[in-house]
Amino acid sequence: MGPAGCAFTLLLLLGISVCGQPVYSSRVVGGQDAAAGRWPWQVSLHFDHNFICGGSLVSERLILTAAHCIQPTWTTFSYTVWLGSITVGDSRKRVKYYVSKIVIHPKYQDTTADVALLKLSSQVTFTSAILPICLPSVTKQLAIPPFCWVTGWGKVKESSDRDYHSALQEAEVPIIDRQACEQLYNPIGIFLPALEPVIKEDKICAGDTQNMKDSCKGDSGGPLSCHIDGVWIQTGVVSWGLECGKSLPGVYTNVIYYQKWINATISRANNLDFSDFLFPIVLLSLALLRPSCAFGPNTIHRVGTVAEAVACIQGWEENAWRFSPRGR
């Protein structure tokens, strides 16, 4: 174990916060494969083991993601979160956790309040490859730097036939002023001041259209990570946009805007609730039931394979992505 690994172990033993402090800090130019251990809070969200979205580890038991990645009618225990691996489908290094509870922001609608928290079935064990990212403080004014990083397994080109990239991608993107972003997305707004703005206070814009650096379909729910005062802080959640990396920047849910709700949800999640007792019972029941059993009128039926479930999920994601506000 090297000096960095020893220091990391000491921090854990002393109970000192390790959020936003990856052990490895090697860099790869934006838009290419990310180095192992550089983004230890990055997680992949799966439905019946099929990749659907990204997310970030924000505590020992909570994942932050986009609300549009989740459908409330789907069975919670069919969701899993994979941590510790930068390659989708690599079962050798990833650690899998089931989702026991889903909390979607109560005001979520279309692109508004596009944020959700997932409670894992058990606490995560932190390692050099699995660490949480820090969240903004509600009591301290946060100065967002001019450049931050977006990570995910989404398309590297909008025209790509693949729905996601197997290797985790990273890109350094400039933060775009909200008013400037509003003018890009809503150019007639300056002539119609009564028109409702597109880029509201709960959104952040980021992207480099000249060098084609942007998030895209498949990156939904992933973090916008900013290096501030020596630690990595999540300031955004990949939400939507138009034409990946071309003429308009990507739009992210503003984590700072929803931080009070996030803190309150995390605080409640740390307490035992009904889901902690129900989840083991549900898993046991599933083990005893046949694969073709139905759980209700809104359930996606599984007959031997998960083809129908995947088609439903990918179809919803594709429609959201094509919708004027892009759901990745």
Swiss-Prot record:
Main location: secreted
Segments forming a coiled coil: none
Active site: residue positions: 68, 114, 220
Keyword Transcription regulation: no
Signal peptide (residue range): 1-20
GO cellular component: a single term: extracellular space
Glycosylation sites: 263
GO biological process, one term: proteolysis
Disulphide bridges, residue numbers: 53-69, 148-226, 181-205, 216-244
Entry's localization field: Secreted
Positions of the Peptidase S1 domain: 28-267
GO molecular function, one term: serine-type endopeptidase activity
Family: Belongs to the peptidase S1 family.
PANTHER family (UniProt xref): SERINE PROTEASE 48, TRANSMEMBRANE PROTEASE SERINE
Protein's name according to its UniProt entry: Serine protease 48
Designated gene of the protein: PRSS48
